[in-house]
Every structure is written in structure tokens, then in C-alpha cells.
Amino acid sequence: MPVIESAIQRVRLTKKQHDRNEPQLSAYRTAVKKFEKAAAAGTDNLAELYKAASSAIDHAYSKGLIKKNKASREKSRLAKYVK
């Protein structure tokens, strides 16, 4: 356990940030996996799932969970399947 007060505060803050970020990251990953699974199966609602995955990627980027280039790369990679 940290002894210095600023270190104690950082531990508290890090836990708070983790508790906030983890569900958002999970939702982003789940949306992408759902789309990839549907694309592999060849289902017909790919456009709808792409929209949800793209929205989840944008949300993760706007919250600072992923970087701009990763967001663009993910969306581009998923867009190949929609055509």
C-alpha cells in the first residue's frame, strides 16, 4: 500500500477511472466482435451491425480509450465487409 498521500490519491483515482473505462471498452469490443461474427456467417443485417460497431468505435475514441489512428483503422477494416 502506498504511504505518501499523493500516491494514495492516485490509487483512488486510477480505480475510479478503471471502473469507468472498463465497461465502455467492453461495449466497444463486443460491438466489433458481433459485427465480425455476423460478417463471417454472412448474415444480411451487416449494415445495421456496422453502424453500431462504428458508433461504438467513435464513442471509445471520443472518451480517449483508443487513439485516432486505431479508430480509423478499425472502421476501415470493418467497412470492407459491408460492400
Swiss-Prot record:
It comes from the Bacteria. This is Small ribosomal subunit protein bS20. HAMAP family: Ribosomal_bS20. Keywords: Ribonucleoprotein, Ribosomal protein, RNA-binding, rRNA-binding. One of its GO terms (molecular function) is small ribosomal subunit rRNA binding. One of its GO terms (cellular component) is small ribosomal subunit. Belongs to the bacterial ribosomal protein bS20 family. It holds the Pfam family Ribosomal_S20p. Binds directly to 16S ribosomal RNA. One of its GO terms (biological process) is translation. NCBIfam families: S20. The keyword Cytoplasm does not apply. InterPro entries: Ribosomal_bS20, Ribosomal_bS20_sf. It comes from Leuconostoc mesenteroides subsp. mesenteroides (strain ATCC 8293 / DSM 20343 / BCRC 11652 / CCM 1803 / JCM 6124 / NCDO 523 / NBRC 100496 / NCIMB 8023 / NCTC 12954 / NRRL B-1118 / 37Y).
